[in-house]
């Protein structure tokens, strides 16, 4: 993180989220996890996707900072680009695909947390394997 990003004490963080997201090379990296929410940055390579999914008990807000793509939200497809934001309520089927020539970069807030605290996966395959084997479970209580 650059000089604008710092820790302020007991799990209190300050960062310029768009810069952190742009600098992230990983498919998915957890930046911060609290009791009720989690901040994650993602970089989707050209032709890649997050993957069709439903979070039964977790709301998700995604903000796109670079690239272009498509959002599939409950059976409807919409174009997305830098500056767009999507709010996905718990129980909604969704997927986000990179349809451009550059990485699709975003940050997302989950409430409650969806992934293991401090998890980082360089590729979608690594992230999927961690989920399949139970190594990407969110903290409890």
Could you describe each region identified by the protein language model?
Residues 1-36, 121-141:
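A short, N-terminal "cap"/entry segment at the start of jelly-roll beta-barrel domains
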Residues 37, 46, 57, 76, ...:
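A generic "binding-loop/recognition-motif" signal
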Residues 61, 87, 102-117:
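A short hydrophobic beta-strand segment most commonly corresponding to one strand
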């Amino acid at each position: 993180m650059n000089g604008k990003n710092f820790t302020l004490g007991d799990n209190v963080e300050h960062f310029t989220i768009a810069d952190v997201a742009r600098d992230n090379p990983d498919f998915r990296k957890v930046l911060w996890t609290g009791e009720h929410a989690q901040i994650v940055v993602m970089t989707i390579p050209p032709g890649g996707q997050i993957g069709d999914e439903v979070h039964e008990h977790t709301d998700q807000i995604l903000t796109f900072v670079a690239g272009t793509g498509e959002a599939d939200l409950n059976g409807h497809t919409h174009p997305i680009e830098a500056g767009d934001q999507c709010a996905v309520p718990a129980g909604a089927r969704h997927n986000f695909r990179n349809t451009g020539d550059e990485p699709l970069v975003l940050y997302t807030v989950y409430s409650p947390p969806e992934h293991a605290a401090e998890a980082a996966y360089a590729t979608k395959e690594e992230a999927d394997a961690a989920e399949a084997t139970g190594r990407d479970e969110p903290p409890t209580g």
